């Protein structure tokens, strides 16, 4: 049985190396990641069961440890590796953002913020800190709350602006409900933060609300579909 499993793993790796990573299905990609099975299940079978249980790659990447471990043969080591791979992708995106993005490229900025915030189960409030040329200095997640609210204070934001010597920033937060409409509370905190930043000569460029597949710009009062 183990010989058959090993041959299966080698076949998948050969397919990837010969035909390219895009030639693999979602389940095959997961199987390559899982790498090895056990005496009873191959890596392909484990990948199939994980996909059947959680539905799709997005759900798998955002699953908690207990959901992941519910598939017999998958444990903390594979889960830790999966989370590390996810964070590597996030950091790679940010490197690109730092090098390439200016304020004029709003779609890429929105796409980056959506990737970072969309799948959080609790409302999370973040900021992109910019220099006076609107180049990215840092991305930081500043506040985290419950499923439908996060308490946000202007003072720590202003302090961080001064520490980073930022000239401007873009705020963003997610709505775990999936809806990107800005609430009255969102509008009120935006105004408070903008007024606080004015006191230190920093400019609030926008506040973005992240839904499931949409982002809403409070300053532009527009929605964009952002898959």
Curated annotation (Swiss-Prot):
Q: Which UniProt keywords apply?
A: Hydrolase, Metal-binding, Metalloprotease, Protease, Zinc
Q: How is this protein named in the record?
A: UPF0758 protein lpg2489
The transmembrane residues are none
In this chain, Zn(2+) is annotated as bound at 173, 175, 186
Q: Which residues form the signal peptide?
A: none
Against InterPro entries, the record matches this protein to: MPN (IPR037518), RadC_JAB (IPR025657), RuvA_2-like (IPR010994), UPF0758 (IPR001405), UPF0758_CS (IPR020891), UPF0758_N (IPR046778)
Keyword Metal-binding among record annotations: yes
- MPN domain: from which residue to which, for each copy? 102-225
Kindly list the biological process annotations in GO that this record carries.
proteolysis
State one Pfam family annotation: RadC
Q: What is the lineage of its organism?
A: Bacteria, Pseudomonadati, Pseudomonadota, Gammaproteobacteria, Legionellales
Statement: the UniProt record of this protein carries the keyword Zinc: yes
In terms of domain of life, where is this protein from?
Answer: Bacteria
The Swiss-Prot or TrEMBL record describes its family as follows: Belongs to the UPF0758 family.
Q: What residue intervals hold the motif JAMM motif?
A: 173-186
| Disulfide-bonded cysteines | none
GO molecular function term, any single one:
metal ion binding
* Annotated organism of origin: Legionella pneumophila subsp. pneumophila (strain Philadelphia 1 / ATCC 33152 / DSM 7513)
Q: What NCBIfam families does its record include?
A: PRK00024.1 (NF000642), radc (TIGR00608)
């Amino acid at each position: 049985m183990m010989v058959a499993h090993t041959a299966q793993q080698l076949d998948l790796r050969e397919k990837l190396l010969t035909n390219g990573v895009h030639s693999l299905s979602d389940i095959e990609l997961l199987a390559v990641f899982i790498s090895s099975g056990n005496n009873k299940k191959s890596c392909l079978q484990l990948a199939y069961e994980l996909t059947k249980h959680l539905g799709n790659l997005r759900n798998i990447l955002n699953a908690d440890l207990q959901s992941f471990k519910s598939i017999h043969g998958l444990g903390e080591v594979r889960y830790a590796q999966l989370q590390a791979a996810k964070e590597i992708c996030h950091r790679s995106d940010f490197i690109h953002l730092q090098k390439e993005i200016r304020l004029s490229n709003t779609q890429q900025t929105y796409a980056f913020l959506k990737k970072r915030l969309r799948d959080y189960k609790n409302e999370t409030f973040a900021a992109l800190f910019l220099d006076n040329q609107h180049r990215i200095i840092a991305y930081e997640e500043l506040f985290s709350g419950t499923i439908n609210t996060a308490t946000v204070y202007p003072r720590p934001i202003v302090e961080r602006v001064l520490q980073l010597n930022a000239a401007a920033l873009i705020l963003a937060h997610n709505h775990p409900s999936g809806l990107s409409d800005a609430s009255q509370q969102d509008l009120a905190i935006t105004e408070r933060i903008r007024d606080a930043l004015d006191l230190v000569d920093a400019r609030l460029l926008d506040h973005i609300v992240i839904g499931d597949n949409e982002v809403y710009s409070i300053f532009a009062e527009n929605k964009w579909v952002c898959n």
